[in-house]
């Protein structure tokens, strides 16, 4: 396929800027709204479960979609689907504004339409998850169509950088600011930003229809099997996926209870909580800017090891303290390590996997890397609820951070052997079994 100029990448980067800003606003607004509806950690964690569940049950089909159909159109239609779902949620919130509490209540809120709103939120969360897994898989497969392999690490670094700036630096505090006006304001902005993103995606020029040698009439299960077999025979990518999956499991275990941790143990309001995320934003932004330079100076195995160490330290720190500045700093370490890992791992697999299989193999990889997220989320909420009955509320909310830190230490100690530079070099030279 003919490579387009930097113009196409800049259009993709701009589209990602607006869609990630929308995601950042929504990423703050939805959990905060839900914390006004209930104080039950299990009920809150179910939202995260449903958003992530499609990564477990639908991701392999998303890979087939990305290989069968025009990836640019997939990015367009999934964003429009998000606009439609968000619009439904706006109407639902508007009709119930008089009943939803305006401030956090540490006792369980009670109002007539509570069950309806929570049930609708669960359904919409699952639908959002379906669109997101389809969009994200297509996006990672689309990038090599407009960027040369040599420029993939730099391009991925810029995309991760934009994601962090808009998602955390801008999206989270803007979400906190907007929700101060009205509960529906952040969601209205979300839909507008997604529409702007669609405008830039459709401006990308090129021939992005799938090649004729892809048999679109081939049985879906056979296409999925091809992707599974390819990854099964690549030891490096298989291990990278498993490592990512374990780390994401414990990250997703912590995420749904973080809002309760911040409100109850640190005592933050909406604006203060949004600024807590600046720690993650700063760490991730620095990581996105230096990842390419670090990758150029260090062997891949060393970069991956540093990533695991930083992510683990950041994951464990909130167990030790509720100081908001230290917690924000721990978020920064985790984010830096996560970006460093992702730039390296994503670039490796984009360079190694053939375009004709990229969507499917990428989906199998993401199944291993992200498929445990819904289980981690429900486990996190359940374990807090169980421990809350036998121990202090503080210990219950801190325990997921202790557990995550322990398992990240295990990953760190095993990485030098399982993700060795020798294995990486063999894989790049196509000599791996």
Predicted regions and their residues:
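C-terminal ends and interior cores of transmembrane alpha-helices
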Residues: 80-113, 309-322
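Juxtamembrane intracellular "pre-TM" segments in multi-pass secondary transporters
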Residues: 1-9, 206-242, 433
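Cytoplasmic helix-loop-helix junction between adjacent transmembrane helices
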Residues: 124-167
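Transmembrane alpha-helix termini and helix-breaking/packing motifs in multi-pass membrane transporters
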Residues: 31-37, 91-104, 169-189, 264-265, ...
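Loop-to-transmembrane helix entry/capping segments in MFS-fold secondary transporters
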Residues: 41-42, 149-159, 270, 355-365
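Helix-loop junctions on the cytosolic side of multi-pass membrane transporters
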Residues: 96-97, 141, 145, 187-217, ...
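C-terminal transmembrane bundle of multi-pass solute transporters/carriers
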Residues: 56-61, 68, 72-74, 78, ...
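Helix-loop boundary and gating motifs at the non-cytosolic
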Residues: 1-56, 233-280
